[in-house]
Structure formats: C-alpha cells, structure tokens
C-alpha cells in the first residue's frame, strides 16, 4: 500500500511539473504568395512551440490592429507545445507596413515581428 501511495504522489508531481514548463513562441510572418503590389494576398502569422497555451496574437497594419482576422484552432505538437495560425487578406504596396504582435507569459513585453516581403 505504501508503494502505491508513493507511486501516486510521483505521478501527481510529474503532472503538475508539466504545467510549469514554459516555452517561448516562435513567430513567423509571411504572405501566402510572393508579394506583388496591388495584388490581393494573405498575410500569415504562424506562432509555434509555445507553452502554456494562453497567448494573444494581433496582426498589425502600420502599427494598428487589423480587426478582420481569422485563426486556426489551437493545436499541439508531439512535444505538447502549442501552435496557431492567424491570417487575413491584404493587398501589399510600398507604403504600408505589416507585422504580427504576440503576447505570452514568456515575454516580458509583447513581441512584434515585421513582415518582410522578400521572405
């Protein structure tokens, strides 16, 4: 009986330890198709490898939040880290700047990654 209690405690401790693991998200910002000025496209922000799952993602145009944004369901990888895809339709040009801003507990402040049309 004592062995069972010890084993049960070890299992509970290991489960609570999983929640304590924190991984910072990797942020990738890219367009669906190669950028051409004046041609409609999709702006994507792929956020992956993060834990815990609480995260806030915004797509930005000239530093302001884009309101009409869609996203995938929250999913997890084999290593139990999470990933998401946020996307919106946009039309590239030479004057507007696009970016993805991510807030996660592993960042001391929100992190913004700019879209590079040459990537």
UniProtKB/Swiss-Prot annotation:
Subcellular localization: Secreted
Principal subcellular localisation of the protein: secreted
Domain of life: Eukaryota
Keyword DNA damage appears in the UniProt entry: no
One of the Pfam families matching this protein, by short name: C1-set
Tagged with keyword Disulfide bond: yes
Disulphide-bonded residues: 45-100
Keywords per UniProt: Disulfide bond, Immunity, Immunoglobulin domain, MHC I, Secreted, Signal
Signal peptide: 1-20
InterPro entries for the chain: B2Microglobulin, Ig-like_dom, Ig-like_dom_sf, Ig-like_fold, Ig/MHC_CS, Ig_C1-set, MHC/Immunoglobulin
Domain Ig-like C1-type: start-end pairs: 25-114
GO process terms (BP): antigen processing and presentation of peptide antigen via MHC class I; immune response
GO cellular component, one term: extracellular region
Known role: Component of the class I major histocompatibility complex (MHC). Involved in the presentation of peptide antigens to the immune system.
Subunit annotation: Heterodimer of an alpha chain and a beta chain. Beta-2-microglobulin is the beta-chain of major histocompatibility complex class I molecules.
Protein family membership: Belongs to the beta-2-microglobulin family.
Protein name: Beta-2-microglobulin
Gene from which this protein is expressed: B2M
